[in-house]
Amino acid sequence: MVFGDSLSAGYGLRPGEGWVDLLRQALPAHQVVNASQSGETTAGGLSRLPAALARHKPDIVILELGGNDGLRGLPPDDMRANLEQMVAMSAQSKARVLLVGMALPPNYGQAYGRAFQMVYSDLAKQRKLPFVPLLVEGFATDRTRFQADGIHPNASAQEQMRDSVLKVLRGMVKN
């Protein structure tokens, strides 16, 4: 189950173009559920996760949240607490977590950006989670790979996003 925000929900893309749809195609022997929601913060995800876990009963949760927390300037400590609770909830439901990290545009300042990114790496290390440090790895500064808003990757970036996740996910699934 992919549990994320607009980057995983396929914001601004045609149906079937998003990285989660491409992941589903790459793993035909597995059921890939997209429980992502555009605009989702970690607080919103925390409130939605229990129902999603109960409904879908996933073996793996790909947790891709926090970008909207950062874009709103919310405290990284709050984001970390919410992510920690979601990891714990997932573990309680017997699901393994693959954590997906984010980065912020530089206009948020170096200190905030560093604290924001450290949430992911610290949590992955502390909880020994499989980890994709940056969903937009390899094209984060390439404006041609983003929609007009400069935040959401366009269709040309989706395979690379899928591949970043798949590289780590393959070690978690049996094919």
What are these language model-derived features?
Residues 22-26, 47-175:
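Alpha-helical cap/lid subdomain in secreted, periplasmic
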Residues 1-41, 48-57:
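Serine-esterase "nucleophile elbow" of acetyl-processing enzymes
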